[in-house]
């Protein structure tokens, strides 16, 4: 966990550092584009690791936990992968299983760094649609870091732009993707932008 350079990160009005590991994991899930390889772990078992905040370190799954894993794999379209070795699936399939693991945590906040990495266009749209559904139908706060502006524009309810020396406030997609903002974000001249 990185310490903030300034200020504090609050979750439900409390400093993030006030939460113990399991309590934090029940509130906040993180999906990174790369993960450690595991030996002889099925996709079901890998996704089930998201239940550890509820099962404890021994990871003994109850029937409720197993159902949560099945539901998460189904939601991301990875049910057929459940019995396959996590190391023997494609990068795109791995992204789906990583998302299922995060969903298994049943967090209130889901942070994703470049979740569409390694996915083809169809896979990107499917994954982003799942994230949008989680936000709109389940009330999950979904925060996504993307460099693909076209994808962000399709799904975002709010956009925060990271400039070389500053960060914008929350913008509507219309504001964020206005030509003048894109030019400023990428330090483009009008001619470069319109080329």
Per-region residue spans from a language model:
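Conserved ABC ATPase "signature" region
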Residues: 48, 63-81
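H-loop/switch region of ABC-family ATPase nucleotide-binding domains
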Residues: 146-147
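H-loop (His-switch) and adjacent beta-strand-loop-beta switch element
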Residues: 159-172
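Catalytic Walker B motif of ABC-type/P-loop ATPase nucleotide-binding domains
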Residues: 110-113
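Conserved ABC transporter NBD signature motif
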Residues: 7-15, 24
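Conserved catalytic motifs of ABC-family nucleotide-binding domains
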Residues: 106
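Conserved ABC ATPase signature
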Residues: 60, 85-89, 93
């Amino acid at each position: 966990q990185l310490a903030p350079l300034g200020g504090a990160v609050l979750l439900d009005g409390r400093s993030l550092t006030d939460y113990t590991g399991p309590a934090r994991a029940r509130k906040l899930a993180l999906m990174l584009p790369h993960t450690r390889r595991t030996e002889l772990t099925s996709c079901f078992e890998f996704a089930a690791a998201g239940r550890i905040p509820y099962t404890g370190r021994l990871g003994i799954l109850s029937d409720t936990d197993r159902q949560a894993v099945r539901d998460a794999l189904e939601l991301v379209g990875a049910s057929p992968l459940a019995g396959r070795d996590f190391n023997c699936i494609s990068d795109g399939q791995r992204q789906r299983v990583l998302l299922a693991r995060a969903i298994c945590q049943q967090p209130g906040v889901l942070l994703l760094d470049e979740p569409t990495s390694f996915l083809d266009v169809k896979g990107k749209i499917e994954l982003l649609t799942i994230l949008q559904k989680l936000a709109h139908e389940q009330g999950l706060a979904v925060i996504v870091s993307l460099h693909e502006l076209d994808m962000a524009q399709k799904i975002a309810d709010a956009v925060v732009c990271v400039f070389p020396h500053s960060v914008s406030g929350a913008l509507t997609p219309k504001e964020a993707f206005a030509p003048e903002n894109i030019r400023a974000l990428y330090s483009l001249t009008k001619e470069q932008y319109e080329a």
